[in-house]
Structures are given as C-alpha cells and as structure tokens.
From Swiss-Prot:
PROSITE patterns: RIBOSOMAL_S17. One of the primary rRNA binding proteins, it binds specifically to the 5'-end of 16S ribosomal RNA. This is Small ribosomal subunit protein uS17. It comes from the Archaea. HAMAP family: Ribosomal_uS17_A (MF_01345_A). CDD domains: Ribosomal_uS17. Keywords: Ribonucleoprotein, Ribosomal protein, RNA-binding, rRNA-binding. Pfam families: Ribosomal_S17 (PF00366). It comes from Pyrococcus horikoshii (strain ATCC 700860 / DSM 12428 / JCM 9974 / NBRC 100139 / OT-3). InterPro entries: NA-bd_OB-fold, Ribosomal_uS17, Ribosomal_uS17_arc/euk, Ribosomal_uS17_archaeal, Ribosomal_uS17_CS. One of its GO terms (biological process) is translation. GO terms for molecular function: rRNA binding; structural constituent of ribosome.
Length: 116
C-alpha cells in the first residue's frame, strides 16, 4: 500500500520523494494555517531545520519612502523536501514545533544550482 499525499490547501505540487516524518505537512499530521512567505535559505546546519531570510518593504511616513528590511525565520525542513543553502523556498505557518520554529518548508521554488 503506497502512502498518500495530503492536500495542504496550497496550489503547489507535492514533493516527488516520500518520507515518514510526522511533522511533514505532505506525509505527516502537521496542519498549516496563517501566513505564507517566500525566502532564501541561508543556513541548514541544525538537523531538519533551515533558517530562511525574507526581504520586505516598510513604509516610512516621515520621509514618504520605503526602506528594505529583512527578517530571519527558523522553519522545519522535512526529509522529502530537503532544502539546502541558497534555495528559494516557500514556508507556511503552523503550530509551534519548538521554542523558535513556527513555520515549515512546503516547497522548493528554485534550487541554488538553477539560480546561477
């Protein structure tokens, strides 16, 4: 019996690989809700965790201009997705997985090798 891929509510393709991670939104029991961000993986050193940096514009009322800001978010990296440093990924909000992890990687939009 082949393991089914769950519908997570986003219009993206599920990963081709299978995994047995219970914290995987595709093959496990993890539900996603809330915000969805796109960013670049800047670190993948902790096991099953990536640090994603996203850039956004913030309006400064005094100067009537926008400034570019960035934030770093820790996200769970399931084995079936396996994002690496330099990859452009899509992350979605979920329940707290640890003290600092509240997001999970749901897709790799562009691999680091393809971006060069």
């Amino acid at each position: 019996m082949e393991k089914m891929v769950r519908d997570i509510g986003l219009r993206i393709q599920p990963p081709a690989e299978k995994c047995d991670d219970p914290k995987c939104p595709w093959h496990g029991h993890l539900k996603i809700h809330g915000r969805v961000f796109e960013g670049i993986v800047i670190s993948d050193k902790p096991r099953k965790t990536v640090t994603v940096e996203r850039q956004y514009y913030h309006y400064l009322k005094k100067y009537e201009r926008y400034e570019l800001r960035r934030s770093r978010i820790h996200a769970h990296n399931p084995p079936c997705i396996n994002a690496k440093v330099g990859d452009r990924v899509l992350i979605a909000e979920t329940r707290p997985l640890s003290k600092t992890k509240h997001f999970v990687v749901v897709a790799v939009l562009e691999r680091a090798e393809e971006r060069r």
